[in-house]
Amino acid sequence: MLKIVLIVVVVVLVIFLVPRLFSGSRAVPAPDSPAPDFSLPSQEGTSVNLKDYRGKWVVLYFYPKDQTPGCTREAHNFQIDQAKYNERQAVVLGVSVDSVTSHKKFCAKEGLNFKLLADQDGRVSAAYGSLTNLGVAKFAARHTFIIDPSGKVAKTYTSVDPGGHSEDVLAALDHLQKR
C-alpha cells in the first residue's frame, strides 16, 4: 500500500511540478501594467505589431495548438462574435507557437478571418507568462489578455473554458469600456 501511495505522489509531482520547472515563462502581466510589445508574423505572412493597435481594444488570446478540439472551439466562438468585437472597437489576435503555415491551414479549414500569430520561438508567450516548455515540446497556455487603447493590460484570464470564453470576454469589454 505504501508503494502505491509513493507512486501516486511521484506521478502527481511530475505532472504538476516538472512543467513549471521547464516553463521559461515570466509572471503574467498584472492589470494596469504595460502590455509587452511584440512583432509576430500572421497567417498571411505579414508582421503584426501590438503598438499598431494603440487606440483600440485588443483581445490577445494564447492557445496551445492549431486544429485541436478545444482550440478550434475557442477560435470558432471568437469568429462567430467578430461583429460584436467590431462594435466594441476591439480586435482579436490569437497566438500559439505553431508556424505561419499551420495557422494558414487552420484559418482556411475553419473559416477564421481574424489574425493568428506565429510565436515559434515562444518569446512572446513567455513575456505574457503563457509558455509551457517541456524541453522536447513547448506550447502556449490557454490565457487571454484584454489590452486597453493606451496599451495597458486591463484584464487577464488564466483559467479559460474554450466553450464560453468569447462571451465572457465580451461582457468584460462592456464593463471595462463603461469605466
Predicted regions and their residues:
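Thiol-/selenol-based redox modules, centered on thioredoxin-like
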Residues: 139-179
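Short loop/turn microsegments at loop-to-beta-strand junctions
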Residues: 35-36, 57, 141-143
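Structural microenvironment flanking redox-active thiols in thiol-disulfide oxidoreductases
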Residues: 72-112, 120-126
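A short beta-strand-turn-helix
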Residues: 29, 38-58
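Short active-site neighborhood of thiol/selenol oxidoreductases, capturing the structured segment around
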Residues: 50-73, 78
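N-terminal targeting signals for export/organelle localization
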Residues: 1-41, 179
